[in-house]
Amino acid sequence: MEHNFTWKNDGRTKVMIGCGTRPEIIRLAAVIKRCREYFDCCVVYYNQNWDRNLSTVFWEDFELKNTFGEYGPDILVPVVGENLGVTCGNILGRSYELLSELQPEGYLVLGDTNSCLSAISAKRLHIPLFHMEAGNRCKDECLPEETNRRIVDVISDVNMCYSEFARKYLADTGLPKERTYQTGSPMAEVLHMNLEKIQKSDVLERLGLEKDKYILLSAHREENIDSEKNFLSLFTAINALAEKYDMPILYSCHPRSKHRLEKSGFQLDPRVRVNEPLGFNDYNKLQMNALAIVSDSGTLPEESSFYLSIGHPIAAVCIRTSTERPEALEAGDFILAGITTRELLNAIDMAIEMKQKGVLGKPCPDYVDETVSMKVVRIIQGYVNVVNKMVWRKG
């Protein structure tokens, strides 16, 4: 595989980080910076999200430079094929080739995307494998992410969980307790790192919006977009929301979602404004000033908890029928709304009224820890040799 990356060979541990989507760039932003500080580090991007608004803009937002001094990963690996089988095959084949060539001493992945399946290559090559966001489960087999989670959790040498819920789940399935750690979510550190930029964003002026006079929408998950029944149910509910509140609904729209809407011919209410995907700083400025946020994003519960912790609560409503973040529900940080009109309107009404009355949850401790990147690099540094000795019988 053609690339220009070479290790510095400065004596530090050689760590490769694999990712391939916008959420991974966001969640890993602080960890990548910390790894570059303490490791001989290589970041590989598998380019699942190839659109500039879903990739390039986020390297820039977080000022994530590669070893060549440019915004972006050290190695860009094209993997997207004409179908899922080809894409997953490319991820496995090309990651195996790259890992075989560069032989990192540790390989780090986060989450449940198809890019995380590159972990299989690291495992087969006996490279110590570290997994962030381990143990998350929504118990919904319709979600492709649920399959990926199980695969990567089981094969990882060290699992790093956000919450006690996740750690207990892994322990109950028989995975080694001595190599499973609760680190907390990396999102608070990422949000705090960019908070000044978020607050300075002029996105409201650029889009002609006013504080508390719009609703922010994000809907992109496969179960909401690709299922005909769920798609019609959700966007019928969105139209009803526009009718009831009679204000702009700004839809930060993923290219796949936009294509699905165009192909379906579904007529959105004129008050629903379909917008290109927004950058991290702009999107969070919009979240902080919206009357309510309606989203199927996995980061919503964590963002809601963070904003609550800094005295800026948001009315967060999740348009899903399951969640892998029960700890945030337990803390009262968001409402799980479902996707029918009745469910969504009731949830929105409740979220807005509670915010206005100051009836709030409490910040989830797992979501407001700003030392996660430090924990991650320490765990990696400490366990590379342990895994080599105890798992692979090296040395």
Each predicted region: which residue ranges?
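Glycine-rich phosphate-binding loop signature in dinucleotide/nucleotide-binding domains
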Residues: 10, 98-105, 209-210, 289
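Active-site and donor-binding regions of nucleotide-sugar-utilizing enzymes
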Residues: 14-19, 24-34, 38, 58, ...
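Donor-nucleotide binding loops and adjacent catalytic segments primarily
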Residues: 48-51, 56, 199-289, 394
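Short acidic-hydrophobic, aromatic-tinged amphipathic segments that line or gate anion-handling sites
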Residues: 77, 161, 273-276, 335-340
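A donor-sugar binding/catalytic signature common to diverse glycosyltransferases
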Residues: 108-110, 116-119, 131-132, 159, ...
